[in-house]
Structure formats: C-alpha cells, structure tokens
Amino acid sequence: MSGLTLASFLRTSGVACVVLERIDRARVEVRQRAGVVDARAVRMFEQWGLADKLLAGPLAQTIDYRVNGVGRIFETIEDDGSPGRFCTQQMLVNNLLRELIDVMAGDIRFSVTDVSIQNDEDRRPRVSYSDAAGAHEFVCDYIIGCDAEHGVSRASIPDGVLTKYSHDFGYAWLAALVEAPVTGHPIMGVSDHGFVAQLPRGPHRSRYYLQCALSDGPADWPDTRIWDEIRLRLCDNTIENAVVHDKDFVPMRSVVYAPMQYRNLFLVGDAAHLLPPTGAKGMNLALYDVDVLAQALVRAARDHDRAALDAYSSTVLPHIWKYQEFSAWMTDTMHDAGDPTQNGTFRQMAARACLDNLFDSPTAARLHSEYQRGLN
C-alpha cells in the first residue's frame, strides 16, 4: 500500500519511479488487509489531488465502546470538518493499482524475486531482481523500502546502524473475517471474558478480533468457539453464527527502528515500525511516512535540494513515537479493562475508569479524538 501510494504521488508530480512487487497483480488485489483511513490521511490525499479517485466507504466518526454488554457511542470531535473513512486497505490498494497502472501508466513490475540492494557510499544505488524474463539490474537515485517487516530493504543495512526499540504485550488477537456486516457502529468491547472488536470490511462482511494466547493457533479456535466467545464477550446471545472466511493470529507488539534512512535508502511503514492494531494506526503511520518522503523526493528532484530528504528520519520519528504511545495506551486499556486474570482487578477497574473518562471529560474526549483522527 505505501509503495503504491508513494509511486502515485511521485507520478502525479512528474517524478519517475519503478515499483517492484513480489506477487502478481491478481493476488495483490484480493489479499486481505486491515486498516481505516484516518482524517489526517484523508486530508493528505486531498492535498495530492487524489482523494476523489482513491477513497471510498462510510465516514469513520463513531465507536461503540462496550463494557459487559453495555455500550456507549463515542463520537469523534471534528472542529475542522475532516472525518476519516472506513476505506479498507484492500479497497485503497485496488484503487491505487487502477490509478497508477491503468490511468497514470506507472511502471510496476509484478512477481519479482531475488531482489538485491547495493547502497554504496561512492556510487549511485543499484537494485537487481529476477522475473519470468530473467535477471535485471537498474541504477537509481534513491531506494524506498516499503517491503514490510521481513523485506530486503532493512536487512540490507549494515549491523550497528539501526537501533531497535520493541515491546511485547504478552497476548495476541485472533482476526476472523466473517460473512456478517456491522449492523450498528464499529465495536470495541470488553467483559470479564476478554476483549472483542468488530470492524466493517465492506457491505456484507466484517472482521472480529478476539484476545487470545500467544500460543494459540487455528486448531484452538474452531468456528463454533469463535462465535461462542463473541457472544460471551459482547454479552449478547442474539448474535448468530455466520461463515468464517479466514483466521489470522496477530501478536500484540510494538517495534521502532531508528534512524529510518541509510545513505540513499529510506524505510517506510512496517519496514521501520510496527504497532498493535488496537489504535488502527499502522496503515496511517505508513501514509504519514509516505507524505513526508514524497514531498522531500519531489523537492530533491525538482530543486536539487536534499535538505528535506536528509531530515526525513528526524522529521517522522517524533510523530511515530506519539502514536506508538497512543497505541500502547489503547492496547493496555482495552485489555486491562477485560479479563482480570490478565493484570488483576485493580488494573481492570483503573482501565474502565479511563474508558469512563472518554465520556465524562471533554478534555479526554478531545484528546482521544485528535489521536483517532491522526491530528495530534
């Protein structure tokens, strides 16, 4: 997603670029991805002139926070009229592919393997790769690593250059895509039995997230258990079973690598930082990286001015750490407020008081809205 977005911004600005993608277009188009486009990202697409072409889905303005089955609707405070959208990452990727390839005639090469990076100090960067036609190599000015946690970009940086900051929360989420739409508002729920969330994934489907053990796998969660736990954690016996299309297990953890650049290689999104999905900020932080980097690359290409590029890491990291803190707070609060065997009844009651604050304190509500919208 971040690579396609960056390429679209550069192409719009007249800056040439090549996108290497390890899988074919058909698989890219159907691959399921989580994410909601926050208000800051909507504003970003508007500023690049692509919002009308890329964004779709209902406005993301409300969350139903439920404690032991009792729901309260949190409405984000929008002083500037810039709401987020429930445009899923899969929908955004498909729109980006159509715009970049079919409209802009951008250069994207699918099904590549054996990607290798040469980022030497005394010559221009080189990238080599293979595809069905054979081996290839090209020379470029900059390499942008949008290849996620296990890609070749960060791995190409010598040992000792980057510092890794990480935290493991000690539990995981089961993410289940189901044939059942969200009938009201998106849900973030807790009960003494644990955490559960339901978020929309198109008009007919939704994705449920259930707190589980790090050691759990598909054999531990047959479909019947998934629905039993959803009913139990939402305290709602009227919820009916539906088809479960897929199940993923996501460990709750946070990671930041710094700096996010080395010579002419720049890291973006999951290649540089990971967040627990509780705050829905992973995709939006990647889009923030893309926005800052795209502006810097355009400035370097048009004006031969590298100042913004050289300052890329120091520009984006303070924002990333703010949202790491927000995501950690959301994760701790939503899970401490649930199953008391997690961290005890004191932490449970303190976390539930934090949730009460969102509805009792205008100051807390405004701050929470700023983070939800990506505008803090």
At which residue positions do the language-model features occur?
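Conserved mid-domain beta->alpha element of the FAD-binding
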Residues: M1-T12, A16, L20, L97, ...
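Conserved FAD-binding catalytic core of PHBH/FMO-like flavoproteins
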Residues: R98-E99, G106, V115, D122-E137, ...
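Residues in the short beta-alpha loop(s) of Rossmann-like NAD(P)-binding domains
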Residues: I23-R25
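Active-site-adjacent segment of FAD-dependent monooxygenases/related oxidoreductases
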Residues: E29-M104, Q118-E121, Q324-S327
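Residue-level detector of anion-binding/catalytic polar loops
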Residues: A16-C17, A51, D107
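Short, well-ordered alpha-helix to beta-strand connector turns
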Residues: G14, A105, C140-D141, R263
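C-terminal helical "tail/cap" subdomain of flavin- and related membrane-associated enzymes
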Residues: A280, Q295-N376
